[in-house]
Amino acid sequence: MLGKIVKVVVDRPLGSVHPNHKDIVYTVNYGYVPKIMAGDGEEQDAYILGVDVPLSEFTGKVVAVIHRKNDIEDKWVVAPENLVISKEEILEAVHFQEQYFDIEIEM
């Protein structure tokens, strides 16, 4: 999946609040990749990095996969095709939500 170009439908834009956990504010755009099913039986979730404005959809490259060791699903990290990003930058960007999980980042 790494390196693949995908379209993400953003259902939780930058600055929005988690629908079930009101203390979680999305510091990045977050959504799903239509027609790609994840381990939880829902469409594949994705963080969008490298874009600092709220979006409704985005097409970009899968630059990393966040494996949740203590959960049944992985999260994709999607970014503009030419963006160079480190594991540390990804960890910092997704910490607002991934801090509750034991994760490993594949790049």
Where are these regions (language model features)?
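Hydrophobic N-terminal alpha-helices or hydrophobic patches in metabolic proteins across all domains
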Residues: 1-107
